[in-house]
A protein has these predicted regions:
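Acidic, Ala/Val/Gly-enriched low-complexity intrinsically disordered segments
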Residues: 2-9, 22-23
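Cationic, low-complexity basic patches in intrinsically disordered or flexible, solvent-exposed regions
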Residues: 12
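S-adenosyl-L-methionine
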Residues: 24-70, 80
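Structural motif
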Residues: 70-72, 96
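Class I SAM-dependent methyltransferase "Motif I" SAM/SAH-binding loop
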Residues: 75-76
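Conserved SAM-binding loop of SAM-dependent methyltransferases across substrates and taxa
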Residues: 80-90
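Class I S-adenosyl-L-methionine-dependent methyltransferase module
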Residues: 88-191
Length: 191
């Protein structure tokens, strides 16, 4: 399982706390995107990462000259196109994202609004997982986290931490639910 957040990201977030504005998280996100190569932080089936050139070719020829552009992403998934557009076009002042998966949207909102509370939750679940020595114990932890995640009564921080964990440790980063709406992907070989 990869580290939940790059140390540089956390340091950057800590530095931007000195900005006295209600929009500091937006400012830190924009400056972070401009200073780093932001990439999707979750795996997602059907990602647009390999289609970026074809999709970008569909933009109006003068798009980079538009003032205060708004980017709308109706099927954000892992966010490859979103991150590319925000880095490539500094004239995009607003981004609106959507997806049918409410837990995915909760994940994006939690990263945007509560990253400082999310980081310790991710570190805790990662430490528990790495402390396990054998594959059987790791598989048991995966199943316990999956069961708790499926209870659907979690606060956004816990929900997102479990969502991340399952995404990183399940089979191929797949998100699939059964007829009851319960996440049912087995553990993967990332263990």
């Amino acid at each position: 399982m990869a580290a939940p957040l790059d140390v540089n990201v956390r340091q950057h977030i800590n530095k931007t706390k000195g900005i006295h504005t209600d929009d500091w998280k937006i400012i830190s996100l924009n400056s972070l995107i401009m200073k780093t190569k932001a990439k999707p932080f979750i795996k997602w089936v059907g990602g647009k990462g390999q289609l970026i050139e074809q999709l970008e070719a569909k933009l109006p020829a003068d798009f980079d000259n538009w003032d205060d552009a708004t980017y709308i992403e109706p099927f954000v998934g892992g966010g490859a196109m979103l991150f590319y557009m925000l880095q490539r076009y500094p004239n995009i002042k607003y981004a609106v994202i959507n997806d049918i998966n409410s837990d995915l949207i909760t994940c994006y909102k939690t990263v945007r609004d509560n990253v400082e509370e999310l980081i310790p939750a991710l570190q805790d679940i990662q430490a528990q997982y790495y402390a396990l020595q054998d594959m059987g114990a790791k598989r048991e932890m995966f199943m316990a986290v999956r069961q708790r995640y499926n209870e659907k009564n979690l606060d956004p921080i816990e929900n997102t931490a479990k969502f991340f964990f399952l995404n990183r440790t399940c089979f191929n980063g797949l998100y699939r639910v059964n007829k009851k709406g319960l996440f049912n992907v087995p553990c993967g070989k990332f263990m």
